[in-house]
Each structure stands twice: as structure tokens, then as C-alpha cells.
């Protein structure tokens, strides 16, 4: 997001979000990130992957939205899709619990990796509400402006896409429910899949089968939640 490292944005999102790039919050966010890079701080995900969720899932293809909070802050993990890690990196604990629920819900095998790109390419928008983070410093880029931008993304999906399933796991994701038109979309809520909370209702929530049932009910192809081996 620096001036010399222009980030490409998929055309349908660029059109829908064009006005956001002229907002005061975006100028402040750009300046904050410029200073972080100038100070030599290591920022995740790498610049070209910051908008990977949008570039992997064009607006008109969105069927399911999963909200995360901010990117993983360990080296080599984050690549712009919430809950997902790059190939060769072990699946983090919350993602392992997502896999356990998929196995219980849809009888899918537990994948040997944590790379969720195939979900994104089928129409699952894997959106972190804060899109960057400093290495080893969780939530270091929270409340710097990203939330305005990602709130608008959620609103745009709610306004422009038909019959979307929103999966809101945990209090932070559920705080975004006010941005979603519940008369047009299916909103499914549970506790976060973190090991701290998954046993209080994430396991057994059945969100993946319920999402596919809703999509099929509205004439859309279901998501193949199984992941190809790497």
C-alpha cells in the first residue's frame, strides 16, 4: 500500500469501492502504513497479498462470507485470506477446529495443509476486518482505518449480491451483523473456533451443510468444502 508498491485490485471490487480510496480514513491509513514500512517494520501479509481475498473472489461471485479479525502475525503464515495459511505452514489451532467441524458435519477428511485458496475461488470471501498486522504484534493495525474499509465491503456484498451466507464466528464477527440485510441473506452465528471457545457451540454448529443447503435452495451450486491435497 505504499506509493511505489501499487496494489492491484480486481475490477468488480475496484468499481464498487472506488469512492473509499478518496475518503479521509484511507489517506490516514496509507500514511500509517507508509510510516510502518519506512520504519523497517515487517508487515503481513506481503504487499501484493493484502487484497488477496478480494482478488480471489470477485464481487459478483460471492456466495459465502467468513469474517476473521486480523492476519496471522507469524512469518510466512498470512496471505490475505482469513483463517488460511500459506502452503507448507501447519494449520493453526482455529483452522484445525474448523476442519474437525467439517469432518463431523460433512464427513470430510482432515486436510494435510491450511491453504484455503480453493474456497476463495469458489465464492467464499475470506475477509479479515483488519487487513494488515505487524510481525509478532497481534491487533497492531486495528483501529487504523481498515475497519471502515471492510465494513463497506460487507455492506456492498449485502446490497449487491443475492442470497449470501454470512458465517459470523465469535463476538467480533457478530458485531458486523448490523451491516447485513438479514431479509436477503442467511446469517449463521456461533462462538469462535478457537480452542478457547470451540467446545461452547462451534463444534456441532453445522454451518457448512446449512450454507450449502441455502445455496442449493436458491439455485446455486454448493461449495466443495474439501480441500485438494498440496
Swiss-Prot record:
Q: Supply the InterPro entries for this chain.
A: UDG_fam1, Ura-DNA_Glyclase_AS, Uracil-DNA_glycosylase-like, Uracil-DNA_glycosylase-like_sf
Q: Name one GO cellular component term.
A: cytoplasm
By its UniProt entry, which SMART domains does this protein fall under?
Answer: UDG, UreE_C
The record's function comment reads: Excises uracil residues from the DNA which can arise as a result of misincorporation of dUMP residues by DNA polymerase or due to deamination of cytosine.
Q: What class of enzyme is it?
A: hydrolase
What subcellular locations does the record give? Cytoplasm
PROSITE patterns recorded:
U_DNA_GLYCOSYLASE
Q: Which GO terms describe its biological process?
A: base-excision repair, AP site formation via deaminated base removal
Q: Does the keyword Cell inner membrane apply?
A: no
Q: Which domain of life is it from?
A: Bacteria
Q: Which GO terms describe its molecular function?
A: uracil DNA N-glycosylase activity
Q: Where is the active site?
A: 70 (proton acceptor)
Q: What name is this protein filed under?
A: Uracil-DNA glycosylase
Gene3D superfamilies per the UniProt record, alphabetical: Uracil-DNA glycosylase-like domain (3.40.470.10)
The family assignment reads: Belongs to the uracil-DNA glycosylase (UDG) superfamily. UNG family.
Could you tell me what reaction this enzyme catalyses?
Hydrolyzes single-stranded DNA or mismatched double-stranded DNA and polynucleotides, releasing free uracil
Give EC number(s), comma-separated: 3.2.2.27
The UniProt gene name for this protein comes to ung
Where does this protein come from, organism-wise? Pseudomonas entomophila (strain L48)
Q: From the record, what ranges are coiled-coil? A: none
Keyword list (alphabetical) reads: Cytoplasm, DNA damage, DNA repair, Hydrolase
Q: Does the keyword Hydrolase apply?
A: yes
Amino acid at each position: 500500500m505504499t506509493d511505489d508498491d501499487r496494489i492491484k485490485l480486481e475490477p468488480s471490487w475496484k468499481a464498487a469501492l472506488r469512492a473509499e480510496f478518496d475518503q479521509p480514513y484511507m489517506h490516514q491509513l496509507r500514511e500509517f502504513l507508509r510510516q510502518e514500512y519506512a520504519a523497517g517494520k515487517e508487515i503481513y501479509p506481503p504487499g501484493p497479498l493484502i487484497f488477496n481475498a478480494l482478488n480471489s473472489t470477485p464481487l459478483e461471485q460471492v456466495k459465502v462470507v467468513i469474517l476473521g479479525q486480523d492476519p496471522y502475525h507469524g512469518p510466512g503464515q498470512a496471505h490475505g485470506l482469513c483463517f488460511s495459511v500459506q502452503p507448507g505452514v501447519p494449520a493453526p489451532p482455529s483452522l484445525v477446529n474448523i476442519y474437525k467441524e467439517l469432518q463431523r458435519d460433512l464427513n470430510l477428511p482432515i486436510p494435510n495443509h491450511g491453504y484455503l485458496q480453493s474456497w476463495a475461488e469458489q465464492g467464499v470471501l475470506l475477509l479479515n476486518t483488519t487487513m494488515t498486522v505487524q510481525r509478532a504484534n497481534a491487533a497492531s493495525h486495528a483501529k487504523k482505518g481498515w475497519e471502515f474499509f471492510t465494513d463497506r465491503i460487507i455492506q456492498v456484498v449485502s446490497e449487491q449480491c443475492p442470497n449470501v451466507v454470512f458465517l459470523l464466528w465469535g463476538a467480533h464477527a457478530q458485531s458486523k451483523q448490523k451491516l447485513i440485510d438479514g431479509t436477503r441473506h442467511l446469517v449463521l452465528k456461533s462462538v469462535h473456533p478457537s480452542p478457547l471457545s470451540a467446545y461452547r457451540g462451534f463444534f456441532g454448529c453445522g454451518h457448512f451443510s446449512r450454507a450449502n443447503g441455502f445455496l442449493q435452495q436458491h439455485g446455486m451450486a454448493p461449495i466443495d468444502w474439501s480441500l485438494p491435497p498440496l
